[in-house]
């Protein structure tokens, strides 16, 4: 992340990369859904499994590429059972999110930016609460999709969303 941060941030400047990221995530989810048997639990994971899953997590630094989608899909593709794949993905999110927060705080301190003063405490707290509630329901929904072998529906949603974003970016220019 630190090594390619500037290049990755440039990718967020255009909506076309968002559309491509949504479509890419949908493809990865569909491939993982259709991958072979998923029978290995945490005790049967190989030493290489976390390294491969962590590498997939790094791909999610790209715009609109889902971190949990990448980690869960890579675990499923490696033959790890669905519940273990989801649990491992959410455990991996802790250091990734903490690292992102530390990096953002460092940038704010370095540049002298004071988001708290600029935005205010109440909107920040309210935003955090809404994000936590939305995140909780998103995680619950994702776990149900994983357990019920219905990632294909989420893939279709991502393909449609990606197509709409690309259509807007390349033709309509309503949002971008």
Language-model features: where?
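Multi-pass membrane proteins that catalyze or facilitate reactions on polyprenyl-/lipid-phosphate substrates
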Residues: 1-176
């Amino acid at each position: 992340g630190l090594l390619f941060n500037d290049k990755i941030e440039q990718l967020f400047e255009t909506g076309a990369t968002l559309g491509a990221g949504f479509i890419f995530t949908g493809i990865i989810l569909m491939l993982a859904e259709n991958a072979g048997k998923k029978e290995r639990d945490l005790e049967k994971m190989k030493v290489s499994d976390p390294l491969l899953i962590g590498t997939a997590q790094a791909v999610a630094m790209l715009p609109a590429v889902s971190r949990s989608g990448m980690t869960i899909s890579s675990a499923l593709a490696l033959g790890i059972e669905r519940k273990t794949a989801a649990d491992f993905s959410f455990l991996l999110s802790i250091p990734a999110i903490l690292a992102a927060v530390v990096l953002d705080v460092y940038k704010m301190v370095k540049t002298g930016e004071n988001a708290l003063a600029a935005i205010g405490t109440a909107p920040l707290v309210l935003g955090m609460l809404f994000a936590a509630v939305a995140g909780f329901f998103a995680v619950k929904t994702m776990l149900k999709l994983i357990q019920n072998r219905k990632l294909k529906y989420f893939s279709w949603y991502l393909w449609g969303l990606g197509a709409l974003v690309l259509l807007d970016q390349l033709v309509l220019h309503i949002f971008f």
